[in-house]
Regions:
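N-terminal chloroplast transit peptides
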Residues: 1-57, 61-62
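N-terminal Rossmann-like FAD-binding beta1-loop-alpha1 element of flavoenzymes
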Residues: 69-119
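N-terminal FAD cofactor-binding segment of flavoenzymes
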Residues: 105-162, 178
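Predominantly flavin-linked oxidoreductase catalytic cores and closely associated redox partners
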Residues: 109-113, 186-337, 347-355, 367
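FAD-binding beta-loop-beta segment adjacent to the flavin cofactor pocket
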Residues: 286-289, 343-362, 415-423, 432-438
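Flavin-binding catalytic cores
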Residues: 312-342, 382-410
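A conserved FAD-binding loop/helix module that cradles the flavin
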Residues: 367-388
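Long, low-complexity C-terminal extensions of enzymes
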Residues: 385-507
Length: 507
């Protein structure tokens, strides 16, 4: 089976090089850190899934509707990295596994406090093989506006051929090279050491952990942070794993022209007129709808992605690709060349990790993806200071043993308020799983008519349970009578489940 590339923790997704068979051993890599673990990450037979708004990896696609021009060169930074030397460093305070945005963000902030940090990754300077799309205000709040290479003043949602919504919220694409360089420079200046290798295992002793690397080196550390994305090979889960799946097929392309306003990104296009001449595709789309997500960079360069918001099991890639081909034909988009092709997957929902446990997680490995949307980039970067502060504080306490330290980090990362919030988001995912195309259109018609504070907060994980309950009532009040009846009929079982789970939560 072909390898599956698991983007680093800040990216909520998995970019698959081919379909994934259940029950077979899977090979994963986080940014660069590879793991082989057949007892974890399993997907329904014949399905693969996509990463966040714009994860990319150059892969073979079984159905490509045009001639493809690929740039196979893998970009890398060229810093003179300070290397970990086991002859002079007997032990470090923190080992970060994975050099993705989340891992580097924590490494940078922990090292600012004088804590010794080693970051392990087979290609620590490699540019991340995924693009990130974010709301501009999310990056502005973290002083990262200089790390956006393209922004759109607003976005648009097409519900059908007659109705669309304009979203007055700027959207941006992350400059991957700039963001990584900024984080790497901070790490280097703070004295973070780097070790180029794969992590094979972590062995826990009473007062430290041993990180076993592929080159034979074993590094002793007080704390281990798993920032490897969705590999789930270092962080433990107990409950059965049965998430929803967000699937997508997309590419950056040079085109003769396209019909979209270059000042607006296309957040969702639920129109289905392009399928009217194919009864099978139309019937399938009616049941399990997909939408177009597009970033127009200019009049003849654009990112196009056909996306299944959430399904269980995921919509097969071949089906998604066929719908994309029909959509492009209908929109009269003639693709001249393709720069990047991506087949991507996001597991959404599912159980939280075992808490506490010795290995600390962040991002995908800590189940931080938004269960209703698939978003995670800004949420994870915003959580990095929380994780870093907890680690620094507990390391500074002479009374802190490794398990109590990790327990504190997990508790700060997943306080009861965040757990309750996630439970509501899982309820939202369950409702979306039950809707067909027409129900989905009615849902988003009501959703984007809410006050900006509410839908902004929902998408950006800024609302907590009391506000989310008001959000739910407002959404129900905004909905049409048909949508209300549908929500009551299909949303009652997941609502009961959410209430039961909330009532059983303990702080």
């Amino acid at each position: 089976m072909d390898a599956i590339v698991v983007p680093i923790a800040c990216h909520p997704g998995i970019v698959a090089s081919d379909d994934i068979d259940a029950g077979r051993q899977c090979k994963f890599s986080s940014g660069s850190s590879e793991f082989t673990c057949g007892h974890h990450r399993q997907f329904p037979s014949g399905h693969s899934r996509r990463g966040h708004r714009l994860p990319t990896f150059r892969v073979h696609a079984s159905i490509i509707p045009l001639e493809v021009t690929r740039d196979a060169k893998k970009e890398s930074l060229t810093y003179d990295l300070p290397k970990f030397d086991n002859t002079t460093h007997n032990r470090v305070d923190l080992v970060v596994v994975g050099s993705g945005p989340a891992g580097l963000a924590v490494a940078k902030q922990v090292s600012e406090a004088g804590v010794s940090v080693c970051c392990i990754d087979p290609a620590p300077q490699g540019i991340w093989p995924n693009n990130y799309g974010v709301w501009v205000d999310e990056f502005e709040a973290m002083d990262l506006l200089d790390c956006l290479d393209t922004t759109w003043s607003s976005a648009v949602v097409y519900l059908d051929d007659k109705k669309k919504k304009y979203l007055k919220r700027p959207y941006g694409r992350v400059d991957r090279r700039r963001l990584k360089a900024k984080m790497m420079e901070g790490c280097i200046n703070n004295g973070v050491k780097f070790h180029q290798a794969k992590v094979l295992n972590v062995i826990h002793e009473d007062d430290h952990s041993l990180v076993v690397c592929s080159d034979g080196l074993t590094i002793k550390s007080n704390v281990v942070l798993d920032a490897t994305g969705f590999s789930r090979c270092l962080v433990e889960y107990e409950k059965p794993y049965n998430p929803g799946y967000q699937m997508a097929y997309g590419f950056v392309a040079e085109v003769d022209e396209h019909p979209f306003d270059i000042d607006k990104m296309v957040f969702m296009d639920w129109r289905d007129s392009h399928l009217h001449e194919d009864s099978v595709l139309k019937s399938n789309n009616d049941k399990l709808p997909t939408f177009l997500y597009a970033m127009p960079f200019s009049s003849n360069r654009i990112f196009l992605e056909e996306t299944s918001l959430v399904a269980r099991p995921g919509v097969p890639f071949e089906e998604i690709q066929k719908r994309m081909v029909q959509r492009l034909k209908y929109l009269d988009i003639n693709v001249k060349s393709i720069e990047e092709v991506e087949k991507c997957v996001i597991p959404m929902g599912g159980p939280l990790p075992v808490m506490p446990q010795r290995v600390v997680g962040i991002g995908g490995t800590a189940a931080m993806v938004h269960p209703s949307t698939g978003y995670m980039v800004a949420r994870t970067l915003a959580a990095a200071p929380i994780v870093a502060s907890a680690i620094v504080e507990r390391l500074g306490s002479n009374q802190s043993d490794p398990m109590s330290l990790s327990a504190r980090v997990w508790k700060d990362l997943w306080p009861i308020e965040r757990k309750r919030q996630r439970e509501f988001f899982c309820f939202g995912m369950d409702v979306l799983l039950s809707l067909d195309l027409h129900g989905t259109r009615r849902f988003f018609d009501a959703f984007f008519d809410l006050e900006p504070y509410q839908w902004h907060g929902f998408l950006s994980s800024r609302l907590y349970l009391p506000e989310l309950l008001i959000f739910g009532l407002s959404l129900f009040g905004n909905a049409s009578n048909t949508a209300r009846l549908e929500i009551m009929a299909k949303g009652t079982p997941p609502l009961v489940r959410m209430i039961r789970n909330l009532s059983s939560m303990r702080n």
